[in-house]
C-alpha cells in the first residue's frame, strides 16, 4: 500500500529558511552501542589476523544467490572498498570511508554503486561474528585489502579506526542536479574546474562517466575530467594512473543487456520485502553472466583474478576503437579483434568473453602526461606495484587524519606527508607555574585581548572534523600558506607571531632544565589568557582549561598545496566573507560550524563571545554591539534583542545592515547577515534569548569558555 499523502513540515512551508539540521548531527547520540562506547579500544582487542583469514576464505566461497565472477569475489570487494573511500574530496574533507557511509543513503543507492549492496551482504557473516570490534567502515576497507592480497598483490598496509555512523551525513553537498548520472552547468566553473566543494563530475558517480563526458567517447574531455576529479581527491597524475591501472587489472564490468530495460529500483526505493537490496535484474538469471551493473560489458584482460601487467600491456600495445556493447553503452574494442573471445567466462571457464577498455582507460593512453606514466610503469613493473600500493593506501586512509588515529598491527612505520606529520615533543612540557608566568607575560605584551584571541582562533579554527585535518597543533599558522591567507590578516598576523616568537625564545633560552614551550601551545595559551582577563573585566572568575603538548611542524612536514584546500572562503565567527564565496554568509557559517563539530548552541555562544571580545576581520565594527569590546559580556545578544532598535539594509547587496534607534533614527551599530541571523532565525533566536537574559550572563561566559576549550583541542588526538 502506498501513502500518497504528504504531511507538510517546517521546511516545506518555508523552504528558504536556513537549515540547521547539519548541526543537529553533532548533538544527537545515535550510536546503538551508547555514548560511552570506545571503538578504538574495541578494535585493539580484535584478532585482525583471524578476520583476514575469514575474509580470504570467503573470497572463493561462491554463493548461489550472488555467484563470484571467475570463482573469486576479490574484484567485487576492491570495487566496494574503492567506492567507499573514493567519495572523499579535498575541498571540505567530506566523504570517504569513515563512518561506513556506503551502507547509508544516498551513497548506498548511487548508480555507481549498483550491486555493491550484494557485496556488503556477503560480508555480513563476518561483521556478525566480530560485532562491535569491527566497524563496517573498517571491514569494507579491509575486505578490499585482503582481496588484493588474495590475488597476488602486496599491499602497503592497513589501519583501523573508522567508527561507524548510523545516520546519513546530511552536511555533504553532492551537487546541484536532481537526477542521477547528470551533469549541470552549475557543477563546473567557466574554466572547467569543479565548483567548491564538489569532487565528482557527475551526480551519483564516484569520479567521472566511464563512457566519457555526457556519455560520449571523448578521450580528451575524459582525461580532463579524470585529472580534475582525481585532483580534487588529492591524487597527482602518477597516483591517478596507478590507481586506475591497478584497480582495472582485476575483474570486469557488467552490462549483459540494457540497464534501463531490465534493472529495478535502487535500495532506497526498493519494496520493503527486498530488505534493502536493490537493482533487481530481470535479464536472464539476473546474476553471473547475466549481471547488469554499469551497462558496460567485459574484462580488461585475460587474467582478471591475478596481479600482473596485462592491463597496462593491453592498453598500450593494442589500438582501440569505440563500439556500443550489449548493454548499449560506449566501450572500446581492439581494432584488430585480437582480444575478442580471449578471456574466460565468469562462471564457465570454457566460455569466452571479449577484452574491452573504457573510455576512461583509453583516455590515459591518449593524454601525453598520463601515457608517459603508463609507459614508465610498463618498463618498470616494480615501480607500478609500489606506486599502486602507496596510492591505494592513500586512497583508503585519506580521510582518517594524522597517524595517531591509525590502529592495528599493519600500520606502516612511515608517516606520509598527506598525514600532516608533527614532530615529537623531545622536551618536558610546561607545568602550572610556567603556564601562569607565560600567561602574565602574554597579557603584558603589546598584543591586545582581541589580537590574542584572534590569533588563537585563526590557528585552531582550520580544523575539519570531516577528515581530521587542520587545528592548532603544529602552529602551521606561522607557515605558508596559512600565514598569507587574507582571512588571517597577514600584516597583523606577522606582528603577532613576532611577539609570540620573542616570548617563546625568551622563555626557552632562560630555562636551565629540559622544559620548553612550543609556539603552538603558546598561541592557544595567549587566547586562553585573554579570555580569562576579559571575563575578569566583566566580573567573572574563570579558568580556561589548557593541556600542553602541541608541537611545531616544520615546512618540510607541510604540503603547501594540500593545506591550501583548508583556506576558508568565509569565517562568520570573525565576520569574514571572501570575494570568492558563492553562498550566503550565514550558510557558510553553519557549514564551518559543522566542520568544527559544533552544535547550534555552540555556534551561537561562540559568535556572541567573539563579537564581545572584538574579534572581527580587519578590526571591523560589524557585529561589535558593545561599548566595551574586549570584555566578555553578553552585550551582543542584549543589543540584538533590544526592541528599542530596528535594522535596515545599508547596501544594495544586503550584506551590511544598520541598527537604528527607533525614536531618533540614529545609527547605533552595524552588523552583517551573520550577526542578524541570531535574531531572525527562530531556533537561533531562542538560544540567543537564553544568553541575552540578565540572569544568565554567567551561563553565557561559562558556555563560551567550555566551547572555546573544545575548539582549541579538536586536533589533540594524543589526549584520547
UniProtKB/Swiss-Prot annotation:
Swiss-Prot/TrEMBL keywords: Heme, Hydrogen peroxide, Iron, Metal-binding, Oxidoreductase, Peroxidase, Plasmid
E.C. no: 1.11.1.21
Residue location of crosslink Tryptophyl-tyrosyl-methioninium (Tyr-Met) (with W-82): 207-233
UniProt-annotated catalytic positions: 83
PTM characteristics: Formation of the three residue Trp-Tyr-Met cross-link is important for the catalase, but not the peroxidase activity of the enzyme.
Catalytic activity annotation: H2O2 + AH2 = A + 2 H2O; 2 H2O2 = O2 + 2 H2O
Cross-link Tryptophyl-tyrosyl-methioninium (Trp-Tyr) (with M-233) mapped to chain: 82-207
GO MF, one example: catalase activity
Positions annotated to bind heme b: 248
Biological process according to GO: cellular response to hydrogen peroxide; hydrogen peroxide catabolic process
InterPro entries reported for this sequence: Catalase_peroxidase (IPR000763), Haem_peroxidase (IPR002016), Haem_peroxidase_sf (IPR010255), Peroxidases_AS (IPR019794), Peroxidases_heam-ligand_BS (IPR019793)
Subunit structure as annotated in this protein's UniProt entry: Homodimer or homotetramer.
Similarity comment: family membership: Belongs to the peroxidase family. Peroxidase/catalase subfamily.
Name this polypeptide is given: Catalase-peroxidase
Annotated source species: Halobacterium salinarum (strain ATCC 700922 / JCM 11081 / NRC-1)
Amino acid at each position: 500500500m502506498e501513502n500518497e499523502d504528504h504531511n507538510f513540515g517546517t521546511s516545506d512551508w518555508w523552504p528558504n529558511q536556513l537549515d540547521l539540521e547539519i548541526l543537529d548531527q553533532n548533538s544527537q547520540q545515535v550510536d546503538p552501542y551508547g555514548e560511552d562506547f570506545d571503538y578504538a579500544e574495541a578494535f585493539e582487542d580484535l584478532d585482525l589476523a583471524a578476520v583476514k583469514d575469514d575474509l580470504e576464505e570467503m573470497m572463493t566461497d561462491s554463493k548461489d544467490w550472488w555467484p563470484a565472477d571467475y570463482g573469486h569475489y576479490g574484484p567485487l570487494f576492491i570495487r566496494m572498498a574503492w567506492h567507499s573511500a573514493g567519495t572523499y574530496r579535498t575541498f571540505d574533507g567530506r566523504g570517504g570511508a569513515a563512518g561506513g557511509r556506503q551502507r547509508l543513503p544516498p551513497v548506498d543507492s548511487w548508480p555507481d554503486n549498483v550491486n555493491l549492496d550484494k557485496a556488503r551482504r556477503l560480508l555480513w557473516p563476518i561483521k556478525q561474528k566480530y560485532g562491535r570490534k569491527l566497524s563496517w567502515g573498517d571491514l569494507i576497507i579491509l575486505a578490499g585489502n585482503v582481496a588484493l592480497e588474495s590475488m597476488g598483490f602486496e599491499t602497503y598496509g592497513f589501519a583501523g579506526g573508522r567508527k561507524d555512523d548510523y545516520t546519513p551525513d546530511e552536511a555533504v553537498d553532492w551537487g546541484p542536479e536532481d537526477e542521477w548520472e547528470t551533469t549541470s552547468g552549475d557543477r563546473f566553473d567557466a574554466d572547467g574546474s569543479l565548483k567548491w566543494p564538489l569532487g565528482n563530475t557527475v551526480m551519483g558517480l564516484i569520479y567521472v562517466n566511464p563512457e566519457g563526458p555526457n556519455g560520449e567517447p571523448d578521450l580528451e574531455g575524459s582525461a580532463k575530467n579524470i585529472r580534475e576529479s582525481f585532483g580534487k581527491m588529492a591524487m597527482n597524475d602518477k597516483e591517478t594512473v596507478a590507481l586506475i591501472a591497478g584497480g582495472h587489472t582485476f575483474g570486469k564490468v557488467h552490462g549483459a543487456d540494457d540497464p534501463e530495460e531490465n534493472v529495478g529500483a535502487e535500495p532506497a526505493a526498493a519494496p520493503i520485502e527486498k530488505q534493502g537490496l536493490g537493482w533487481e535484474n530481470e535479464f536472464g538469471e539476473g546474476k553471473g553472466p547475466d549481471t547488469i551493473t554499469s551497462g558496460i560489458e567485459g574484462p580488461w584482460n585475460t587474467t582478471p583474478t591475478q596481479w600482473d601487467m596485462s592491463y597496462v600491456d593491453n592498453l598500450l600495445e593494442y589500438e582501440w576503437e569505440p563500439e556500443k556493447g550489449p548493454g548499449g553503452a560506449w566501450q572500446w574494442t581492439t581494432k584488430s579483434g585480437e582480444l575478442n573471445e580471449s578471456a574466460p567466462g565468469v562462471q564457465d571457464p570454457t566460455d569466452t568473453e571479449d577484452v574491452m577498455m573504457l573510455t576512461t582507460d583509453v583516455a590515459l593512453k591518449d593524454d601525453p602526461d598520463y601515457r608517459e606514466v603508463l609507459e614508465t610503469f610498463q618498463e618498470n613493473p616494480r615501480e607500478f606495484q609500489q606506486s599502486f600500493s602507496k596510492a591505494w593506501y592513500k586512497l583508503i586512509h585519506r580521510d582518517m587524519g594524522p597517524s595517531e588515529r591509525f590502529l592495528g598491527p599493519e600500520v606502516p612505520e612511515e608517516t606520509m606527508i598527506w598525514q600532516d606529520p608533527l614532530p615529537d615533543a623531545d622536551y618536558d612540557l610546561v607545568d602550572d607555574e610556567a603556564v601562569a608566568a607565560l600567561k602574565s607575560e602574554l597579557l603584558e605584551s603589546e598584543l591586545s585581548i582581541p589580537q590574542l584571541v584572534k590569533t588563537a582562533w585563526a590557528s585552531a579554527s582550520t580544523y575539519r572534523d570531516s577528515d581530521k585535518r587542520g587545528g592548532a597543533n603544529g602552529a602551521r599558522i606561522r607557515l605558508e600558506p596559512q600565514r598569507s591567507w587574507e582571512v588571517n590578516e597577514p600584516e597583523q598576523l606577522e606582528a603577532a607571531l613576532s611577539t609570540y616568537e620573542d616570548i617563546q625564545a625568551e622563555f626557552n633560552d632562560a630555562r636551565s632544565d629540559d622544559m620548553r614551550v612550543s609556539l603552538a601551545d603558546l598561541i592557544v595559551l595567549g587566547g586562553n589568557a585573554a579570555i580569562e582577563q576579559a571575563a575578569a573585566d566583566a566580573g567573572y572568575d574563570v579558568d580556561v582549561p589548557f593541556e600542553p603538548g602541541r608541537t611545531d611542524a616544520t615546512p618540510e612536514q607541510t604540503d603547501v598545496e594540500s593545506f591550501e584546500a583548508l583556506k576558508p572562503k568565509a569565517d562568520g565567527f570573525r565576520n569574514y566573507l571572501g570575494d570568492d564565496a558563492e553562498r550566503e554568509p550565514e550558510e557558510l557559517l553553519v557549514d564551518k560550524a559543522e566542520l568544527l563539530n559544533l552544535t547550534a548552541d555552540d555556534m551561537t555562544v561562540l559568535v556572541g563571545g567573539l563579537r564581545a571580545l572584538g574579534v572581527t576581520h580587519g578590526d571591523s565594527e560589524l557585529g561589535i554591539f558593545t561599548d566595551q569590546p574586549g570584555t566578555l559580556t553578553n552585550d551582543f545578544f542584549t543589543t540584538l534583542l533590544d526592541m528599542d532598535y530596528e535594522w535596515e539594509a545599508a547596501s544594495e547587496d544586503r550584506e551590511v545592515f544598520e541598527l537604528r534607534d527607533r525614536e531618533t533614527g540614529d545609527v547605533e551599530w552595524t552588523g552583517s547577515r551573520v550577526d542578524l541571523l541570531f535574531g531572525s532565525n527562530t531556533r537561533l533566536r531562542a538560544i540567543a534569548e537564553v544568553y541575552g537574559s540578565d540572569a544568565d550572563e554567567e551561563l553565557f561566559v561559562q558556555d563560551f569558555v567550555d566551547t572555546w576549550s573544545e575548539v582549541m583541542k579538536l586536533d589533540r588526538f594524543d589526549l584520547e
